[in-house]
Swiss-Prot record:
Protein's name in the database: Aspartyl/glutamyl-tRNA(Asn/Gln) amidotransferase subunit B
Keyword Iron: no
UniProt KW Metal-binding keyword: no
Disulphide-bridged cysteine pairs: none
Gene Ontology BP, a term: glutaminyl-tRNAGln biosynthesis via transamidation
One Pfam family recorded for the sequence: GatB_N
Catalytic activity reported: L-glutamyl-tRNA(Gln) + L-glutamine + ATP + H2O = L-glutaminyl-tRNA(Gln) + L-glutamate + ADP + phosphate + H(+); L-aspartyl-tRNA(Asn) + L-glutamine + ATP + H2O = L-asparaginyl-tRNA(Asn) + L-glutamate + ADP + phosphate + 2 H(+)
Gene3D superfamilies, sorted: 1.10.10.410
Family in the record: Belongs to the GatB/GatE family. GatB subfamily.
InterPro entries according to UniProt: Asn/Gln-tRNA_amidoTrfase_suB/E (IPR017959), Asn/Gln-tRNA_Trfase_suB/E_cat (IPR006075), Asn/Gln_amidotransferase (IPR018027), Asn/Gln_tRNA_amidoTrase-B-like (IPR003789), GatB (IPR004413), GatB_Yqey_C_2 (IPR023168), Gln-tRNA_amidoTrfase_suB_CS (IPR017958), Gln_synth/guanido_kin_cat_dom (IPR014746)
Length: 497
């Protein structure tokens, strides 16, 4: 933070006010109002037709799947779904918008008044972030600026033009860059879970605009700085950095000129990644500047209650519910549940299958976090390609819980199974490891206690740590014995004496 910003913070209490507009490309096979494919990566201007090029006389035909995916998203975001929505023309000129207007939604969006819960910084409590609306519109084309050649060429690719875009607008409820990232992470998780979008930011299927201003407490009076919209942020890291920079810039700006929201217009700024700062673009247009009016080529869309209910029934268990269930049903830590859920449905299924075989949620969670995910990262593979089936991992973990293998021997078996498609029994034989029989372990412990009466007396006197000396002896006599199992059995046997 700059010296001026630090000084301003010291003089006045400052609250950061953040609202996010998230633009999500929906995962449909064709565009919103024509039959052109939405596949990413095709040569420029090869996925176009008279409709998306805005040719005279070409009429749009609505994509029903885009409506269904929008309703599905709205329901998952706790939005109200109105019985009627309509299409409006948002009129502005830009080279990558060939019609001269964008088909969007103005006063009757397809989703309204929702909320999304996010975890706070402590990871234990939740905060509810309000949603103003989510409206469906067609995406614009893409301008590609070639400044490296020295001639500042700009080329237009209209392949993206007309792709279904759901704009999700939050209330200004976020209070820090970290909260903004947490909101975006939770939203992305939900969207990918629902399979409504792939949310690949590097491909432009998820883009973020951040609205930022400050509330400064001056002698008990709240002063609001002018709102700035930071456009087209293409990574969560850039969202954080842009917000943090903008907070500092607005503090310094207010210290210098005392401009407030009442005497300065809303402006848009871009983010310069290399310079790590925002830069001025233009004054922000108001809705009247776009001259919205109902699109005469498209009928309003009716959304019967039965239609909405059928989509609601197909939602299944959402990530927030799964996260809570994993904690209560399997007894795992909130952080572990969060990581597992964030990996997606396939990892959740793998974990729960392994727990079914192991009978120990906490121990299985530990193996997932430390061993399974580490291996996936090292090998750059998904859980579908993981070489150890979930049931087999669960069986291995159960052997630890039952005292038949200690952690070190179990990890030897785990590493072996990564490269050998064998059962647990075959793997232990291949490694020369023998699972310890319960009767054999009990005989060994009785033998040790008989040879060490002083340990028995010490434990009976309340010094349970005295059994530690016998655990080492047990490992020497039988290297396959689990220290945890030996310790517990020794204490149990002494209690019966």
């Amino acid at each position: 933070m700059t010296a001026s910003a630090i000084l301003a913070c010291q003089k006045y209490p400052v609250t950061t006010i953040i609202g996010l507009e998230v633009h999500v490309q929906l995962k449909t096979q064709t565009k919103l109002f024509c039959g052109c494919t939405t596949e990413f990566g095709a040569p420029p201007n090869t996925q176009v037709c008279p409709v998306c090029l805005g040719m005279p006389g070409a009429l749009p035909v609505m994509n029903r799947e885009a409506i269904a995916l929008s309703v599905k998203t709205g329901l998952a975001l706790n939005c109200d779904i109105p019985p009627l929505t309509k299409w409006d023309r948002k009129q502005y000129f830009y080279p990558d918008l060939p019609k001269g207007y964008q088909i969007s939604q103005f006063d009757l969006p397809i989703c309204a008044d929702g909320h999304l819960a996010i975890s706070t910084d402590d990871g234990e409590t939740e905060r509810r972030i309000g949603l103003v609306r989510a409206h469906l519109e067609e995406d614009a084309g893409k301008s590609m600026h070639d400044e490296a050649s020295g001639i500042s060429d700009t080329k237009i690719d209209l392949n993206r033009c007309g792709t279904p875009l759901l704009e999700i607008v939050s209330q200004p409820d976020l209070r820090s860059a970290d909260e903004a990232k947490a909101y975006l992470s939770e939203l992305k998780l939900l969207l990918t879970h629902l399979k409504v979008s792939d949310c690949e930011m590097q491909e432009g299927s998820l883009r973020v605009d951040a609205n930022v201003n400050l509330h400064i407490d001056v002698e008990g009076k709240k002063i609001a700085t002018p709102i700035v919209e930071i456009k087209n942020l293409n990574s969560f890291r850039n969202v954080q950095r842009a917000i943090d920079y903008e907070v500092q810039r607005q503090l310094v700006d207010w210290e210098e000129n005392r401009q407030t929201i009442d005497d300065a217009p809303k402006t848009t700024r871009g983010w310069d990644d290399s310079a790590e700062q925002t830069f001025a673009q233009r004054e922000k247009e108001e809705s009247a500047d776009y001259r919205y009016f109902p699109d005469p080529d498209l009928l309003p869309v009716r959304l019967p209650r039965e239609y909405v209910e059928s989509i609601s029934e197909s939602l299944g268990e959402l990530p927030a519910v799964t996260r809570e269930r994993l904690q209560t049903q399997h007894g795992i830590k909130p952080y572990d549940a969060d990581v597992i859920v964030n990996q997606g449905p396939d990892v959740i299924d793998y974990f729960e299958t392994a727990v079914g075989a192991s009978g120990d949620g906490r121990r299985t969670s530990s193996w997932m976090m430390q061993d399974v995910m580490r291996t996936m990262k090292e090998r750059s593979i998904d859980i579908d390609a993981f070489p150890i089936p979930a049931e087999r991992l669960g069986e291995l973990i159960r052997m630890i819980a039952d005292g038949k293998l200690d952690n070190n021997r179990a990890r030897d078996v785990f590493e072996h199974l990564l490269t050998h498609d064998e059962s647990i029994e075959q793997a232990t034989k291949s490694l020369g490891i023998e699972a310890v029989d319960d009767d054999a372990l009990e005989s060994l412990c009785k033998e040790l206690l008989a040879a060490n009466p002083q340990v028995v007396e010490d434990v009976k006197g309340g010094k349970q740590q005295a059994v530690g000396a016998l655990i080492g002896q047990a490992k020497k006599k039988n290297p396959n014995a689990s220290p945890q199992a030996v310790r517990q059995l020794l204490i149990d046997l002494i209690a019966k004496m």
